């Protein structure tokens, strides 16, 4: 007789500790994706999605690297299941990118003159006015702020 594969995923130890927060962030993400963007600019419609993605990734990053409350197995499981952005977390581990808001802000192909986003400029080098990033709505994610 052939083996029957079940669709159930085996969750590592400690999953029950982080599952409520991740499910809450997942439901917020669904609301943000289905939210109508009437009266807003096209780019502003994606800002809540970028913000929630940042929150999910930062939550798992803090649990594993800063507070050391989850195991490596659980951390890798969450990354493999798509609960956090693996590339964004990889950037956070590098010096100068500890507070990076999203990956689009450091891609030079999306900006004029092949530079990074305006939110990557430290506050002491900016003018008096408050500037929001066009991609994600960030007001400043430079490490020196």
From Swiss-Prot:
Does Nucleus show up as a keyword for this record? yes
Read off the PROSITE patterns from this record.
G10_1, G10_2
A Pfam family found in this protein is BUD31
Q: Where in the cell is it found?
A: Nucleus
**Superkingdom:** Eukaryota
Disulfide bonds, paired cysteine numbers: none
Identify the GO cellular component terms for this protein: spliceosomal complex
Question: InterPro entries, alphabetically?
Answer: BUD31, BUD31/G10-rel_CS
Keywords, A to Z, come to: Nucleus
Similarity field: Belongs to the BUD31 (G10) family.
Q: Which PANTHER family match?
A: PROTEIN BUD31 HOMOLOG 3, PROTEIN BUD31-RELATED
The protein in question is named: Protein BUD31 homolog 3
This chain's source organism reads: Oryza sativa subsp. japonica
Biological classification of the source: Eukaryota, Viridiplantae, Streptophyta, Embryophyta, Tracheophyta
């Amino acid at each position: 007789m052939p083996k029957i594969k079940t669709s159930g995923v085996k969750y590592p130890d400690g999953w029950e500790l982080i599952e409520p927060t991740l499910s809450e962030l997942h439901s917020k993400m669904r609301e943000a994706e289905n939210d109508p963007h009437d009266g807003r600019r096209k780019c502003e419609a994606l800002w809540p999605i970028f913000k929630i993605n940042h929150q999910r990734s930062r939550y798992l990053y803090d649990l594993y690297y800063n507070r050391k409350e989850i195991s490596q197995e659980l951390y890798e499981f969450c990354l493999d299941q798509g609960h956090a952005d693996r590339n964004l977390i990889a950037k956070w581990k590098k010096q100068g990118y500890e507070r990076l808001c999203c990956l689009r802000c450091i891609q030079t192909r999306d900006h004029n003159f092949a530079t990074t986003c305006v939110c990557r400029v430290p506050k002491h080098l900016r003018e008096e006015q408050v500037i929001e990033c066009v991609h994600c709505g960030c007001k400043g994610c430079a490490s020196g702020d």
